[in-house]
Curated annotation (Swiss-Prot):
GO MF term set: DNA binding
Keywords for this protein: DNA integration, DNA recombination, DNA-binding, Plasmid, Transposable element, Viral genome integration, Virus entry into host cell
Name the UniProt record assigns to this protein: Putative integrase/recombinase y4rB
Assigned protein family: Belongs to the 'phage' integrase family.
SUPFAM superfamilies: DNA breaking-rejoining enzymes
Lineage summary: Bacteria, Pseudomonadati, Pseudomonadota, Alphaproteobacteria, Hyphomicrobiales
Length: 314
């Protein structure tokens, strides 16, 4: 293994020790190492970093910017050991990512989605649990603020009914956290597990909470396809729409509803925001602030509080 490739591996291991997963980063930097070797250059130069980042030439600018970002961050690390390293300056491949505008689900939207899940047809005996699986999965996402991957990866051992707590492991940033459950959520999950034991008695018990009719962990593609089909069925998406409400938007709604309740209870949202950030599994409070944009209820409560402050001063 070349010295540069070894440096890449050491860098990845160091960052993973801090909780980052870096799967795409690792693939990108290994490819960049091969690119440097092909150009007979043992150290990073801005010129070669740009040349590598802009491959393939038909890719989107966002792809180029992401690739250059991998190299820039690694170059800062590498410069400590190799003073010949050039750190590509920021702004060489400017790109401002456009976040999808979140859909603010109403209570009625969620109720119709869950009802449609329970009404999904079952052709075979072994798939009779499927409606209940998606009813519970979508319901849990709507009341917990979990990421889809976190809910999908839940294991039976992660559900503590006595303490009314979920243990979320292997999260986006590699950290575990505890998420409390409401009594009604516990009741629904208990009922689901009872039905699961009845319908899957002949199968080997899966360690995962949400399983397919074959007893495996739910496939993420099937989850999205099911959600899209149900969304079109209840009118959240048009029959031919390729874009529309997403499952991740439930997380946004959970965060905004939490802040609205704080406003209505006359609590200080700025002081409590770090608590919500920890609950959601964010590393930085700024990551949580994104979820708190675009809500009419939030704007109304913020304006109400601002008007009261002005009244108190006059």
């Amino acid at each position: 293994m070349s010295t540069f490739r070894q440096a890449v591996q050491e860098y990845i291991e160091m960052r993973r020790g801090l909780g980052f997963k870096l799967r795409e980063t690792e693939r990108g930097l290994i490819d960049f190492a091969a690119f440097l070797e092909a150009n007979d250059t043992p150290h990073i130069t801005t010129e070669l970093a740009l040349a590598w980042a802009q491959r393939p030439s038909r890719a989107q600018p966002s792809h180029w910017a992401t690739r250059l970002g991998y190299v820039r961050v690694f170059a800062r690390y590498r410069a400590a050991a190799d003073p010949r390293t050039q750190i590509p300056p920021s702004g060489l491949l400017p790109f401002r990512p456009k976040r999808a505008r979140p859909y603010l689900y109403s209570k009625e939207d969620i109720q119709r989605l869950l009802s449609a899940a329970l009404e999904m047809p079952c052709r075979y005996t072994r798939c009779k649990l499927r409606p209940w699986t998606y009813y519970c999965l979508f319901g849990l996402l709507s009341v917990s603020g979990l990421r889809l991957g976190e809910a999908r990866n839940l294991k039976l051992a992660d559900v503590d009914f006595d303490a009314a707590v979920l243990t979320i492991r292997g999260t986006k940033f590699g950290k575990s956290r505890l998420v409390p459950m409401h009594a009604s959520t516990c009741a629904v999950l208990r009922d689901y597990l009872k039905r699961r034991r009845q319908h899957c008695a002949a199968q080997a018990a899966s360690p995962y909470l949400f399983t397919s009719q074959l007893g495996n962990r739910l496939d993420v593609g099937d989850i999205h396809r099911t959600f899209y089909a149900l969304s079109r069925q209840i009118g959240l998406r048009g029959a031919t729409d390729s874009h529309g409400p997403r499952l991740h938007d439930m997380r946004h709604v959970f965060a905004t509803n939490t802040l609205v309740r704080w406003y209505e209870a006359e609590q200080d949202p700025e002081r409590l925001l770090p608590i919500l950030s920890t609950y959601l599994g964010h590393v930085h409070v700024a990551d949580t602030q994104w979820y708190l944009t675009g809500s009419p209820e939030l704007m109304k409560e913020a304006m109400r509080r601002l008007e009261r402050r002005w009244e108190d001063r006059t």
